[in-house]
């Protein structure tokens, strides 16, 4: 049986990139389950436990804004690094003057969510690991604002603030909206085969401001 926790997260901007918009990025309407998992793993991660997202409460209304950002159009390939390591004489850097390109991004602004999640023990837990120990560490970190690395909303430049949520009744911006279909969204990545990592999707339906992920159908 998993051990549950509620975490409030908020920030100025978020970008949960849609895979079909590869050049000029556009965000999903709400946070993806994989982004929520990433935030919790930034607070606490251990090989002996696994996070699972139960619900995402959309506290603030969905608002978009468009910005233009400087990006680079190329990347350093692992094969190039290996060649240089083996003695090849070739540059191993990206010239921003030559590769810089300005691209538009459709971001979410003024975001706030409450993540309901639980963790489960894995086969990599040792004899000193137990749910009580992990929960004490997680609760202490959430109350103190401590993290392994700074959590973010989709992209590292969009910092996520976080704290423990101890409210029983969580108000959302869509309490009066019975149901809203958000279409297909990224659920997470399937890492079971490291040589063929596959995306998983689900049909996102927000009911009164809440995405319930406990029994959703996942499509590979």
List where the protein language model places each region.
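Internal, well-folded beta-alpha domain core
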Residues: 71, 81-220
């Amino acid at each position: 049986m998993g051990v549950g926790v509620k975490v409030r997260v908020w920030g100025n901007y978020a970008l949960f990139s849609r895979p079909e918009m590869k050049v000029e990025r556009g965000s999903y309407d709400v946070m993806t389950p994989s982004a929520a998992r990433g935030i919790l793993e930034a607070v606490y991660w251990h090989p002996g436990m696994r996070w699972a997202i139960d619900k995402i409460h959309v506290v603030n209304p969905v608002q978009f804004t468009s910005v233009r950002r400087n990006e680079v159009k190329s990347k350093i390939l692992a094969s190039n690094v290996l060649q240089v390591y083996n003695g090849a004489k070739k540059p191993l850097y990206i010239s921003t003057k030559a590769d810089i390109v300005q691209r538009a991004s459709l971001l979410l602004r003024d975001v706030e969510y409450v993540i309901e999640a639980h963790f489960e023990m894995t086969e990599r837990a040792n004899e000193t690991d137990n749910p009580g120990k992990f929960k004490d560490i997680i609760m202490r970190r959430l109350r103190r604002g401590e993290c392994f690395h700074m959590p973010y909303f989709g992209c590292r430049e969009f910092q996520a603030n976080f704290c423990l949520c101890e409210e029983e009744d969580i108000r959302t911006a869509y309490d009066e909206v019975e149901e809203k279909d958000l279409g297909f969204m990224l659920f997470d990545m399937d890492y079971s085969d490291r040589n063929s990592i596959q995306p998983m999707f689900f049909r996102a339906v927000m009911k009164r401001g809440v995405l319930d992920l406990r029994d959703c159908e996942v499509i590979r």
